[in-house]
């Protein structure tokens, strides 16, 4: 694959990292081991190289230890799901993928889990722990965003199975959810003094902020991950879509994605200002307003944090792919045993 230069992404927001990272990381690994989520050395090494704990410390920099620990469990679990589907399921058997995703979705609604699925069992138990005592409106918002995240795996497999060409606009609509940020930011509400009022959680400026922030992080991810994803045959990447649609060089496609990243940054700035105006219009009690402003500031800080995370970890390095292709290598556990 041709070499390319990663753009110098500019993000004006302060970098925040959770001071409880070390202690929460230990708890995360204990939970991974207890639930059998890294059953082989290869799977364990992949989790180490991912730095799920560091990513979570940047997602929830203001959370207390207990909230951060819950968050790290979620982020580790979903990185494991992502690896099992995007890299281990090379055959992309659509019916099997649909069955696996349906089982994961069912756990969020209390449906029984098959005995052979450690990931689904862990998801069901983690959701029960997370949802306990939470408002129904928050639970509904989280489930909606998490199901949208899971659905992207089935949608992508369906597009591949039918040989459908990938359009950038359609991809971006999906990418907002496949990157996972909307439900990750739902979890950020757990550390606020009060949950966001429904009128704030679903208002236009908040939706605009959430989408632009998610796409900023997603498009940065596409640049950092394009080499690895190309090598494993994964085509759902903005760089790849632009390159194939325009017949341009890899560097030209990367530079075009950088322009899209900058546009999302401007939208984040605009949406934060519009949110302040919307909060004035709603005339909320001071605690609700403060919670909304705090939540929005955390979304902005995530742009800086996730950029640093991408630059710091080996999740998107490619040196492990050659050893994984060796027939003597230890397999990861499933091709959709999830």
Curated annotation (Swiss-Prot):
Position of the signal peptide: none
Requisite cofactors: Mg(2+)
Motif (NXXXSXXXE motif) on chain: 221-229
Pathway participation: Secondary metabolite biosynthesis; terpenoid biosynthesis
Name recorded for this polypeptide: (2Z,6E)-hedycaryol synthase
Effect of residue 310 to S: Loss of synthase activity
Pfam families: Terpene_syn_C_2
Species per Swiss-Prot/TrEMBL record: Kitasatospora setae (strain ATCC 33774 / DSM 43861 / JCM 3304 / KCC A-0304 / NBRC 14216 / KM-6054)
GO-annotated molecular function: metal ion binding; terpene synthase activity
Domain notes: The Asp-Asp-Xaa-Xaa-Xaa-Glu (DDXXXE) and Asn-Xaa-Xaa-Xaa-Ser-Xaa-Xaa-Xaa-Glu (NSE) motifs are important for the catalytic activity, presumably through binding to Mg(2+).
Role noted for this protein: Catalyzes the conversion of (2E,6E)-farnesyl diphosphate (FPP) into (2Z,6E)-hedycaryol via a 1,11-cyclization.
Reported effect, residue 149 to W: No effect on synthase activity at pH 7 and 8.5
Assembly information from the UniProt record: Homodimer.
EC numbers on record: 4.2.3.187
Cofactor note (record): Binds 3 Mg(2+) ions per subunit.
Gene3D superfamilies: Farnesyl Diphosphate Synthase
Residues annotated for Mg(2+) 2 binding in this entry: 87
């Amino acid at each position: 694959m041709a070499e390319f230069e990663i753009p110098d992404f500019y993000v004006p927001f302060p970098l925040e990292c959770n001071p409880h990272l070390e202690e929460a990381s230990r708890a995360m690994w204990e939970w991974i081991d207890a639930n059998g989520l890294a059953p082989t050395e290869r799977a364990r090494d992949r989790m180490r190289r991912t730095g799920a704990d560091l990513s979570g410390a940047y997602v929830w920099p203001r959370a207390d230890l207990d909230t951060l620990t819950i968050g790290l469990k979620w982020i580790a679990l979903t990185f494991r799901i992502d690896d099992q589907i995007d890299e281990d399921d090379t055959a992309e058997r659509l019916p099997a993928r649909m069955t696996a995703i349906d089982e994961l979705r069912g756990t969020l609604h209390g449906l029984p889990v098959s005995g052979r699925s450690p990931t689904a069992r862990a998801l069901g138990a983690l959701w029960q722990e997370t949802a306990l005592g939470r408002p129904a409106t928050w639970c509904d918002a989280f489930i909606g965003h998490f199901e949208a995240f899971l659905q992207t795996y089935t949608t992508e497999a369906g597009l591949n199975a039918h040989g459908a060409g990938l359009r950038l606009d359609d991809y971006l609509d999906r990418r907002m959810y496949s990157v996972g940020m909307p439900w990750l930011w739902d979890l950020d509400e757990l550390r606020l003094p009060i949950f966001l009022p429904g009128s704030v959680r679903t208002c236009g400026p908040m939706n605009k902020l959430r989408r632009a922030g998610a796409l900023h992080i997603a498009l940065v991810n596409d640049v950092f991950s394009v080499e690895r994803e190309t090598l494993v045959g994964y085509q759902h990447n903005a760089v790849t879509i632009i390159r194939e649609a325009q017949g341009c060089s890899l560097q030209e496609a990367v530079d075009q994605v950088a322009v899209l990243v900058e546009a999302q940054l401007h939208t984040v700035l605009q949406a934060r200002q519009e949110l302040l105006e919307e909060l004035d219009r709603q005339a909320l009690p001071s605690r609700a307003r403060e919670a909304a402003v705090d939540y929005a500031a955390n979304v902005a800080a995530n742009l800086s944090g996730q950029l640093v995370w991408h630059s710091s970890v080996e999740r998107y390095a490619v040196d492990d792919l050659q050893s994984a292709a060796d027939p003597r290598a230890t397999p990861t556990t499933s091709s959709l045993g999830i």
